């Protein structure tokens, strides 16, 4: 349920919707906050604080080499954190998972889309996977998933944190940067965003 608040067109749609929402309300639209809103306010499923916190703090856009859970005491503190994020979206960077499961969820979010976006870009004929530089985590989706998971297990098993080693973390950051330059900022993608996604969000 962590991405249940995502609008159409993933993060691109989210950015355009955020601009419109902020212009009209003074608050921000962020998919992780919307996921919490859906599961806690719109449909009150009586979900635990730890689960809602994991959903709010799952955003893989903010990668770390080590994830230490930080205890969250009550719903009042949690609601205050969420409201602060609506007012200033930079506060999302302060959200930290309160459990190891939440930490796993956050790093898994990055692992899930890093190679999959490359796979999708190749299917859409935007570019070939061999356009990427070889690195410690590989270049193909299956390689990236396997190499990162194995490294995280090796560095985290039996520990009170979730961690990958420095080599794999640097490779992850490089791969993510390559995705931005080669996929998300690609002229074809930008043109479709400008001509299709933005007008649809305005409707």
Regions found by a protein language model. Give the residues of each.
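Aspartate-rich (DDxxD/NDxxD/DxxxD) Mg2+/diphosphate-binding motifs
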Residues: 1-32
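Histidine-centered, transition-metal-coordinating active-site segments
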Residues: 12, 28-34, 38-203
């Amino acid at each position: 349920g962590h991405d249940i608040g995502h609008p159409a067109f993933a993060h691109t749609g989210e950015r355009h919707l955020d601009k419109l929402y902020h212009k009209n309300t003074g608050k921000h639209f962020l998919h992780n906050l919307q996921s919490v809103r859906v599961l806690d306010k719109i449909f009150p499923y009586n979900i635990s604080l730890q689960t809602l916190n994991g959903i709010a703090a799952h955003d893989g856009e903010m990668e770390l080499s080590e994830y230490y859970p930080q205890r969250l005491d009550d719903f009042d503190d949690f609601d205050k954190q969420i409201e602060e994020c609506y007012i200033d979206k930079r506060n999302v960077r302060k959200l930290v998972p309160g459990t190891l499961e939440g930490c796993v969820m956050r790093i898994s979010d990055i692992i899930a889309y890093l190679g999959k976006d490359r796979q999708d870009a190749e299917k859409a004929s935007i570019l070939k996977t061999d356009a990427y530089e070889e690195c410690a985590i590989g270049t193909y989706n299956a390689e990236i998933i396997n190499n990162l998971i194995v490294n995280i297990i090796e560095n985290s098993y039996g520990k009170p944190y979730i961690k990958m080693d420095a080599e794999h973390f640097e490779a992850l950051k490089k791969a993510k940067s390559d995705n931005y330059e080669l996929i998300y900022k690609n002229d074809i993608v930008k043109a479709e965003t400008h001509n299709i996604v933005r007008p649809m969000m305005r409707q």
